[in-house]
């Protein structure tokens, strides 16, 4: 599942991919190989996506990444398509927006992109806050990109979900 997501990001031209891991750090690191850099989130047990986003951002900052923005994607979203990732990246480059979010039938999904100036605001969020809270607080800055696939909305949380999603 994760390999498919990483492959979609690579096919879309994303150069630097960081996969934030938890309990399965070693097998996931082996799974992604050279296609992505695996970074361990010591707070993974909280189950909160925000702690993983913050861990990934801290890693990029510590590595002095030259990234202009960060795509926030889901590892359990194997149906995400490279063309959706490309559309978000293209809209970021063309619009100058600080937040770019894909939308399918007026519902926002993943991956969304936050420009570098917003990273500190994401890092400042407290443990009771969520990425959705962040997006809602900055709704006036969001540039929506309409995509033609519901794959941006679906994440597969169980093996059963994955089996149901297969053609």
Q: How would you label these PLM feature ranges?
A:
Residues 1-108, 121, 140-147:
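Nucleotide and nucleotide-moiety/phosphate-recognizing core
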């Amino acid at each position: 599942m994760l390999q498919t997501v990483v492959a979609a990001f690579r096919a879309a031209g994303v150069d630097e991919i960081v996969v934030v891991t938890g309990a399965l750090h070693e097998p996931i690191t082996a799974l992604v190989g050279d296609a992505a850099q695996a970074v361990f989130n010591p707070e993974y047990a909280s189950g909160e996506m925000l702690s993983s986003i913050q861990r990934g951002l801290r890693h990029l900052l510590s590595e002095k990444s030259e990234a202009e923005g960060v795509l926030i994607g889901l590892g359990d979203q194997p149906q995400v398509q490279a063309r959706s990732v490309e559309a978000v990246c293209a809209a970021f480059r063309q619009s100058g927006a600080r937040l770019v979010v894909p939308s399918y039938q007026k519902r926002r999904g993943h991956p969304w992109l936050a420009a570098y100036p917003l990273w500190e605001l994401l890092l400042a969020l407290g443990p009771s806050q969520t990425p959705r809270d962040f997006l809602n607080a900055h709704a006036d800055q969001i540039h929506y990109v309409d995509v033609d696939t519901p794959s941006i909305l679906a994440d597969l949380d169980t093996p059963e979900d994955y089996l149901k999603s297969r053609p």
